[in-house]
């Protein structure tokens, strides 16, 4: 029931899982977690598995959970305990994500190529029929002369807009999540830049932590509401309203698409209704952003959260990694720590040392700020300001 169609869908990801593992273990060898003599053997076997995937012969056996487990099982059958080491410094989270990103990157490339082919065909038809006139319509009424050249060319031009979206999607996809583990980094001294380069990513995802637990942050009193019967309550109503408003805004593309649904080429009065959903959305979004900035400025964080013994098990990964760094195969270290926790014998070492890019000890905020600045610089707002000022200036 919980697996659903995962095993079937994972076949799409098989060869990308192999590529991700090849980059990951190459990096692990560089930091001493895989032996120099082990790496060539692992890489050769992964290349064999890649060939199986490429031929369409890869299968996930009965009783095997997913593609990641199948690849590791195939390695372990051939190479023994050596195959158990490939998961060191990785979580299912960043492993799944890198597979999806590699798959999406390849799929987007195919779509870009096919879009360019369609574009070329439309331009060719536009040139071929540029002198052939046709009626132009508005409201499905004959309006003005047009041409097949203009008609085909208009659809070709619309594909350039689509190409901008594809480019944005490609840039967002082409970032390396390896090293983020379950979302909080790893205590292994991972070289994330190395896996970024090996897989041809433009950059890495520096920080993929998106969620918060209850009572980890304290909201300002003026931004919460109480209860009529429960005096202890501080409800995050403002954030709940922001969530609802933003969810409503996310529906905007669907609303616009449905309003335009089934309209042929030309102008129709249906399009007037788009203004009613489009124009007010910006005011709502600006209000949400302003309120978020106001609250974030006043948020306080609790500094003593992890003193509570209930959180001791979250340090288990650090212990697994410590054992792996001392030579124990990752899967065996994982099993040992799990048994210690189950027996009540686990005493955590709460001194954690994360150093790789995007981890607790190396946030890379300077790179994130530089990325944001480069994106802001790409808007060239000053060009618009200069043009508008020139128009408004007295002559």
In which residue ranges do the predicted regions lie?
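A helix-coil-helix interface module used to build multimeric assemblies
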Residues: 1-185, 189-203, 226, 239-241, ...
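Glycine-rich cofactor/substrate-binding loops
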Residues: 1-20, 230-395
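Short linear loop/turn motifs
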Residues: 41-44, 210-211, 336-340
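A short secondary-structure junction motif
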Residues: 78, 82, 125-132, 201-202, ...
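Short conserved catalytic/interaction loops centered on acidic-Pro-aromatic/His motifs
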Residues: 168-176, 209-217, 343-348
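Catalytic cores of enzymes that engage adenine nucleotides and/or redox cofactors via long glycine-rich
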Residues: 186-189, 209-243
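Short, intrinsically disordered, charge-balanced linker/junction segments flanking boundaries
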Residues: 196-211, 391-394
